[in-house]
Amino acid sequence: MATKAFHECLLDVYHGEMAGEAAFEGMLARAEDAQQRYIVGSLLQFETEGKAKLRPLLMRYDLSMRDDAESMSGAAAAAGQLNALLWVERFSALGDLVRRSYLPRYQELATLVSADEDPEAARIAAFMGAHERALVALSDNIVAGAPDPAAPVSALLSFPLPRPAR
């Protein structure tokens, strides 16, 4: 049986996905070319798919699937601050933010559920940790000038966006 701590962490992760979706939607408006639209659009798709993966658990545990206005407004404000930065600096700051504020909680989710007790919840919890690590890897790739910075995120998408021609 899932614990109260698991339920609370699950909601925090879901709210993190909402925040990410709001932030990347705001960042998409500042994309300067097809490559930037692909990267930010892939991040937006990633957060949307993350929310979809979490909803069956939220429903099973009778937890709210409603959008959290506080998370979304905070994310929109953060996106505005990030958008004021140049592209590489934007992703350097994003990577730092995710490492500090989101990744620990996403990784904690997998420690709060046992695969023996609830295999589906454990699988989704483990995926969400990988999900957030992929977001950090994308940010690091942009800072490093990698040729396909979105690869870690695209590899985990069920519905990846078409990559633009160079």
Regions found by a protein language model. Name each.
Residues 2-166:
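Non-heme di-metal
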